[in-house]
């Protein structure tokens, strides 16, 4: 089944060309079926890139999905046009009286700031509280995961001696977890961050369990025991060239940045990156939508009593 997108959204044409099953609003209106309502809180500066990455994965499932894109009204975007935001995005005030089957909260390049120093922190905490009553399951990514762990459970983030940057091997801590259905027992995921959540801090919170981690990259996936809140420290949604773009950006700025690990053949940036995470990215998003959203959400969201 397709992902339902506005006809004019730039990602619609990009994904259609990749054979991702996209259904335009005009066609979806004639189908007598309730799509899953997913709200994406996009905190990244270049919103078009992140929305396309996430929509690519959400569109590669057998479920029809209706997307609502959300941005922070308390922050002025410098890298995404006001026209794009006004055409395709909502503010929290516009959707706070609605309910959703699922939510994705993206990362943001603010991890080296204290949480309370982030300009939109107050608005974000309102959204984090709101989704506990109005969303069936939420997927938090990178800084979005750190923010959620801190706000809900007091789990601190810690600075790393150097940026965690590259593709790292991971293992599963628990078998028979629905989120990992179809996973290999050894898989690779991109990371790009200056801070971390530590195992010993998370283990102090009885409501949380660590589902996957890496000897090199540390904790990868944490979830509440009811599966409604999932926290992912890596970036399985990344395009093949995302780390390359970040590396070249920092090199051009004259920053002291290491070559992304396990990314280029023989660590040679002149060669094409090796993509080793795409299959597991698709599996994780598909499993989340199916088992944690579709199988758990009521048909009538307005009758959902949490």
Swiss-Prot record:
The record's subcellular location field reads: Cytoplasm
The record ties this protein, via Pfam families, to: HTS
Tell me what this protein is called. Answer: Homoserine O-acetyltransferase
Enzyme class label: transferase
Report which reactions are catalysed by this protein: L-homoserine + acetyl-CoA = O-acetyl-L-homoserine + CoA
What GO cellular component term, any one, is given? Answer: cytoplasm
* Any GO BP: L-methionine biosynthetic process from homoserine via O-succinyl-L-homoserine and cystathionine
Q: Which UniProt keywords apply?
A: Acyltransferase, Amino-acid biosynthesis, Cytoplasm, Methionine biosynthesis, Transferase
């Amino acid at each position: 089944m397709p992902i339902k997108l506005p006809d004019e959204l730039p990602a619609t044409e990009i994904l259609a060309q990749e054979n991702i099953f996209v259904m335009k609003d005009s066609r979806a209106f004639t189908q007598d079926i309730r799509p899953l309502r997913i709200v994406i809180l996009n905190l990244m500066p270049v919103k078009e890139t992140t929305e396309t990455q996430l929509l690519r994965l959400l569109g590669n499932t057998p479920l029809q999905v209706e997307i609502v894109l959300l941005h922070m009204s308390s922050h002025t975007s410098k890298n995404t046009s006001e026209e794009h935001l006004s055409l395709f995005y909502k503010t929290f005030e516009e959707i706070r009286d609605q309910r959703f089957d699922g939510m994705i909260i993206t990362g943001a390049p603010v991890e080296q700031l204290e949480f309370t120093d982030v300009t939109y922190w107050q608005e974000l905490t309102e959204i984090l509280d709101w989704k506990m009553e109005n969303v069936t399951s939420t997927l938090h990514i990178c800084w979005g995961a750190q923010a959620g762990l801190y706000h809900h459970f007091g789990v601190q983030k810690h600075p790393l001696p150097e940026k965690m940057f590259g593709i790292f091997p991971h293992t599963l801590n628990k078998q028979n977890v629905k989120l990992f259905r179809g996973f290999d027992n050894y898989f690779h995921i991109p990371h790009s961050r200056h801070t971390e959540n530590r195992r010993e801090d998370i283990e102090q919170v009885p409501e949380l369990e660590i589902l996957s981690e890496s000897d090199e990259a540390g904790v990868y996936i944490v979830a509440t025991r009811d599966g409604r809140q999932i926290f992912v420290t890596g970036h399985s949604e990344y395009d093949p060239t995302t780390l390359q773009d970040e590396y070249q950006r920092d090199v051009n700025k004259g920053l002291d940045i290491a070559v992304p690990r396990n990314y280029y053949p023989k660590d040679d940036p002149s060669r094409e990156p090796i993509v080793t995470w795409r299959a597991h990215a698709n599996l994780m998003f598909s499993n989340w939508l199916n088992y944690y959203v579709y199988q758990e959400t009521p048909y009538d969201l307005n009758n959902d009593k949490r």
